[in-house]
């Protein structure tokens, strides 16, 4: 019997998504996905997903723009692993732009305007550049121009023991004839391969006049080897997103972020269906057409329609479902997350707009369900809070190593910066109503290991469902081929750990 016949479901044993979400508002724990037929290894599963219309992520995960989750360290880690980080905006414009630049420069790919000096520059200048900008390899060119004729290169190791700081770098540089160079044009992968085979730290790429076109570094080649699925722009830099509010004053923030090099602008609002956001989307798409715009948050199709009509490239779905969010409790407004994702994402898909599941995700199973019922990628907050890459310091309480984690609608966050209040349209109010809480979470170690665990978990989830990608799963969900079951409270209890005196829970183990 052929595998295609084994994969066909001839008995209707389960509930379709359309039936499942036809009435009640459901969260992830309220249903389970029924298994399919397996004829492939889990390593063959492609978990990639569209973050925006033009940006595909190898790992369909995005870190939330919260001031206790995503700054430059988290954004770098997310992009290295194939996802993307959204740097929060509860800070000054200058601080946010500086964090964006830190991410964009972490892996350079082709350095299009490499730092260069003239041959008569003193050694002291090179040392100052190293201490101020962290650059350890500087080209020496005619006139000191970044696109001038190459004369040599001076590295930190060349001048470590030079006592005369006034001596010209020409005395200590590695000369052009002793350098490995390549001719333009060359593909980034080819340039990295040359660096791997050479024993030099840098590879200048020159035109036929021996003038510098760009530069590649060994450090970037190592990072390319260690993180082959990194999210990169066309120049080989890490992808980076940043959040902003949608008031008139925020146009200056967008200008600074665009100059810093962001790839995606995330409009941060708990309720995105406003005249402010509609107008802001139109302005951004007209003024900065190269920027991808993620709009939201939304939980209904009508909300989604207005933002898509305005020009949104992606939508964030979720209102009041996060672990530190109390919007539904305080304001009686929102929607259960699984239902919101299914309803909004199905409409958005008909318009060619991808969606981000934002909130309510507690484990790999929840992420799998969110992706299965419509989301293209998942935004993580509490799941990655407490990792070493998040902002803040660890502290101990009752013998546990903890890190602070708070909602952007908490009083603590709104008092720290006015931008957090803008998210909830309350920055100018004398009395601010909290829509979030502040708390702490356990130390989770490095997010790099946690993301690898989530990636493998998603692959195994898709394998059990019987499909080789989440695109295929969503297609089968919409066709009624992937089926579900509602879960009673006792069924949920049965599916959790039970009937044990005690147990130890470890999420994953690495085999060396």
Swiss-Prot record:
Activation and inhibition: Mycophenolic acid (MPA) is a non-competitive inhibitor that prevents formation of the closed enzyme conformation by binding to the same site as the amobile flap. In contrast, mizoribine monophosphate (MZP) is a competitive inhibitor that induces the closed conformation. MPA is a potent inhibitor of mammalian IMPDHs but a poor inhibitor of the bacterial enzymes. MZP is a more potent inhibitor of bacterial IMPDH.
Any one GO MF annotation of this record: nucleotide binding
Residue positions of motif Microbody targeting signal: 510-512
Gene3D superfamilies cross-referenced by the UniProt entry: Aldolase class I
Residues at the active site: 325 (thioimidate intermediate), 423 (proton acceptor)
Keyword Metal-binding carried by entry: yes
Required co-factors: K(+)
EC number of this enzyme: 1.1.1.205
Keyword Ribonucleoprotein: no
Binding sites annotated in the UniProt record for K(+): 320, 322, 325, 494-495
Alphabetical keyword list: CBS domain, Glycosome, GMP biosynthesis, Metal-binding, NAD, Oxidoreductase, Peroxisome, Potassium, Purine biosynthesis, Repeat
GO process terms (BP): GMP biosynthetic process; GTP biosynthetic process
Binding sites annotated in the UniProt record for NAD(+): 268-270, 318-320
Homology family: Belongs to the IMPDH/GMPR family.
Protein name in UniProt: Inosine-5'-monophosphate dehydrogenase
Organism of provenance: Trypanosoma brucei brucei
């Amino acid at each position: 019997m052929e595998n295609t016949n084994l994969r066909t479901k001839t008995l209707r044993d389960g509930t379709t998504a359309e039936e499942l979400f036809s009435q009640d508002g459901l969260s992830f724990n309220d249903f389970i996905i029924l298994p399919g037929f397996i004829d492939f290894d889990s390593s063959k599963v492609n978990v990639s997903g569209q973050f925006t219309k033009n940006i595909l992520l190898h790992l369909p995960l995005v870190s939330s723009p919260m001031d206790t989750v995503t700054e430059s360290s988290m954004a770098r880690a997310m992009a290295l692993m194939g996802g993307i980080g959204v740097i929060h905006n509860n800070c000054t414009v200058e601080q946010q732009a500086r964090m964006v630049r830190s991410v964009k420069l972490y892996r350079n790919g082709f350095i299009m305007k490499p730092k260069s000096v003239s041959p008569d520059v003193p050694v002291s200048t090179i040392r100052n550049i190293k201490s101020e900008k962290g650059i350890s390899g500087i080209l020496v060119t005619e006139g000191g121009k970044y696109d001038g004729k190459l004369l040599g290169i001076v590295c930190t190791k060349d001048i470590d023991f030079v006592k005369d700081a006034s001596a010209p770098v020409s005395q200590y540089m590695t000369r052009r004839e002793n350098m490995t160079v390549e001719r333009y044009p060359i593909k980034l992968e080819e340039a990295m391969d040359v660096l791997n085979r050479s024993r030099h730290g840098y590879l200048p790429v020159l035109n036929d006049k021996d003038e510098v076109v760009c530069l590649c570094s060994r450090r970037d080649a190592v990072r390319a080897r260690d993180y082959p699925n990194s999210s990169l722009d066309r120049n080989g830099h890490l992808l980076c997103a940043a959040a902003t509010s949608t008031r008139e004053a925020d146009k200056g923030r967008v200008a600074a972020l665009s100059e810093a090099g962001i790839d995606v602008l995330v409009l941060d609002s708990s309720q995105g269906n406003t005249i402010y956001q509609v107008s802001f989307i139109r302005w951004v798409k007209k003024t900065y057409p190269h920027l991808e715009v993620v709009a939201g948050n939304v939980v209904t199709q009508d909300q989604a329609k207005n933002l898509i009509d305005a020009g949104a490239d992606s939508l964030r779905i979720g209102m009041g479902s996060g672990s530190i969010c109390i919007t539904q409790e305080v304001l009686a407004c929102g929607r259960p997350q699984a239902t919101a994702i299914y309803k909004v994402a199905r409409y958005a898909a008909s318009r060619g707009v991808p969606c981000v599941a934002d909130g309510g995700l507690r484990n790999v199973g929840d992420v799998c369900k969110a992706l299965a019922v419509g989301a293209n990628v998942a935004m993580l907050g509490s799941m990655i809070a407490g990792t070493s890459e998040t902002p803040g310091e660890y502290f101990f309480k009752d013998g546990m190593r903890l890190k602070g984690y708070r909602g952007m609608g908490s009083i603590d966050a709104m008092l720290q910066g006015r931008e957090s209040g803008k998210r909830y349209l309350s920055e100018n109010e004398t009395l601010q109503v909290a829509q979030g809480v502040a708390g702490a979470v356990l130390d989770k170690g490095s997010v790099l290991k946690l993301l690898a665990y989530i990636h493998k978990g998603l692959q195994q989830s898709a394998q059990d469902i019987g499909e080789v990608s989440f695109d295929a799963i969503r297609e089968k969900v919409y066709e009624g081929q992937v089926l579900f079951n509602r879960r009673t409270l006792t069924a949920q209890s049965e599916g959790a750990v039970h009937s044990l005196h005690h147990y130890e829970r470890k999420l994953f183990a690495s085999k060396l």
